[in-house]
């Protein structure tokens, strides 16, 4: 068996970190994969913690604003082990300080071009679900950070070809709302209140995915690329109305779903325009990933209740009071 070298972007972030976790879990002996973890600063606490947990992982210092330099650094490190870069996991930051619409698109396209130029065999792009596997190819939605991902998807499809054996094989993973973005504290209370304002108690459901499971699917692609080649699939592990979400919180943690005043939730969607557009889209259309199909691929995919119990930062004290709020 030839070991595959996988370049993982966003290695110290949620998705990249989950991909590394899943690859390491799938390859405990170290015979299948050699992992190159891209980080802006190799001496950052997060990067140092990563290699402390996984000594086999090799850090590559670089960023997606200079993809040629990133690949040069990666090839030097991969060359030490006489292994070409076989696969790339691509994820870009889409919201936050300094992040722009054009910047995300530029990074995503540049990484595709760089991967092709450097002979990468399989490219996995983490995008976003936009209303079903087929509809996502057509729908950009009104949400800017969904639109960027469709542009990058289209570029990947057009540049690499639609048939296996073309310039570079690829798989697109389209996750829905991240369970992991729910954390103790006021931001989550505001977000959930805004959701409830738009979705009602039981009027409209919303799909959720644990970041852990995004990593599992990426690892499955790298392990069995022929099965997933030239496919684009939505990833969701649960679908809940707000009433069902509240019950999941109560069962898993012993206390109610964290909410605040309805007016505060309305103010959030008014002030944070893009967030308001996204929540409005959740109410009018929403995610439509095929949960049953994905659970056949990955029977251990987490439900919201399971995630709250095993992966979240939510917990209860002896008296049932919330810790960490």
Protein language model features and the residues they cover:
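Oxidoreductase cofactor-interface core, primarily capturing Rossmann-like NAD(P)-dependent enzymes
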Residues: 2-33, 38-48, 65-67, 96, ...
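NAD(P)H-binding glycine-rich loop region in Rossmannoid oxidoreductase-like domains
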Residues: 34-118
